[in-house]
Amino acid sequence: MKFLCAEDNAINAEILEMLLEAKGASCTICPNGQEIVDAFASVKPGDYDMILMDIQMPVMDGLEATRRIRSGENPLGRTIPILAMTANAFLEDMQKSKEAGMDEHLSKPVDISALEQTVKRFRVTPPPRK
């Protein structure tokens, strides 16, 4: 699997990258919401399977970045799964994530087994080739 990730904390980004790579996945890390929006604008089918989005980031937060991805010109933005990964763990925070267009809300520190289960739920499996 290939992930496009937004994480402004360098240590958290490194840990996330190591966890994903240990599971055979790859990821591209963007340090703020504006950079992930810009990166997503040129994404083509098959480039990424899912977005992992921090909420509290400089320049543009994850909620606004999600809104822009969902409403942007790239049609993949309407369907790609976006998972919030954030220290904001209250019910109100989860509701804000959903309202912004996120599919799921995971609290930090992220439990790798919880992340795996969530990814499995939202993974889009391509149809078998004929």
What are these regions (language model features)?
Residues 1-130:
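C-terminal compact regulatory domains
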